[in-house]
Amino acid sequence: MIYTVPDFQNPAGVTLSFARRKQLIALANCHGLIVLEDTPCRHIRFSGQNLPTLQSLDTEGRVIHLGSFSKVLVPGLRIGWVVAAPALLSRLGLLRVAADTQTSTLQMAAASLFLDHHDLTAHIAPLQTAYARKQEAILDAIRQHFPQKITVTDPEGRPFIWATFPDGFDATAFMRDVALQQARVRKPNLLAKATGSARLPFANQRPRSLPAPTFDP
């Protein structure tokens, strides 16, 4: 099995190119592999063009496509969807029953009610705009307070960015200092597992509330 997040991979935010997507499908076909395509942030795109899903490029029914409502409806709505060949779906159904029987009926009913009465695409559009403004605010703060000291991936979507600090800089210690100074980072040890880099979420931040912690390389 191949597990991949082709759109805004976590944590670095890399998006798989169209050519690489076709190569991955060809590789799966050649070796008889199942591809698990996880796309929790695919619909939170600020710029650029959406690329075809791996599932749409699948020619042999090998791709299981996963989507999530938690990023586009309600954060606490921990449900999503699966797109796969019928033979795979029947097996997944059996595994689901063995794992936890079923998803919350109330959550499924709430999502179904929303989808029956609202246009999901129209609902997502203002979210993309709001996230784009928050993203630009945090990038402006980085450019203002950490000029030429922090590099970030070129984020075209998703509600967080991946920052890389200078060589020898302990990102974990820095995040802990920020937590003490600003009371903003709740789990710094989870945000900066690899020394020198950190994932900076901004979904809950208002642009004017973004902190400006002291940075001393």
Language-model-derived ranges and their functions:
Residues 1-217:
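PLP-dependent class I/II
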